[in-house]
Amino acid sequence: EWTAEVVEEAAPAVTPETVCLTVYLIGVGLVAGVMLWQVVRIRRLRRGAAITRTERFTLVRTPQRIASFSFFRSIYVWDQIPAGELQAIVAHEASHVAHRHSAERVAMECMKAALWWNPFVWLAARRLTEAEEFEADSDVLAEGYDIEHYMKTIFRQLFGYSPEIANGLRDSLTKKRFKMMTTQTKSRHSLLRLAGTLPALI
């Protein structure tokens, strides 16, 4: 008489490699998820907005209280901004559009998702943002805008929703930007500055 022998297979052991990979993928998912959610929120700002298309960019004037920003070829502003301030704000954001800063920002956000554990990536992202803002400020002042009026306009634009993935006005950069403008320091092209940060990320 034959008897069947039941052999139980041991459950695979949890290895350090598996744990590290799981944690890494969770981090990638969280950072990428935040980026995608920001894109969704940006798209929603078009609802009920007055949209004006030009050869250089699309101006989206939304009833929602936001801090002005640009995302690729679209410039988003609050529709209650005074006309005297709107021109300088649009000039600033149009500079971001012309220099394709959004493409740089998206590339950096993807790098942050892939290398979220590396603090130098987050530092490089901050430096890139600074370089882009300095470059846009330099372009606006080169067009002949009054520096004092422009600085006041920037200060009044600090409040409201402004996604990290987009190019916008942020409080943390205000003092540095004001100092840069008053010393008339010229910024180099932001792509070159970004390339200079890459060796620190490897």
Task: List where the protein language model places each region.
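Membrane-embedded and juxtamembrane structural elements of multi-pass membrane proteins
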Residues: 1-202
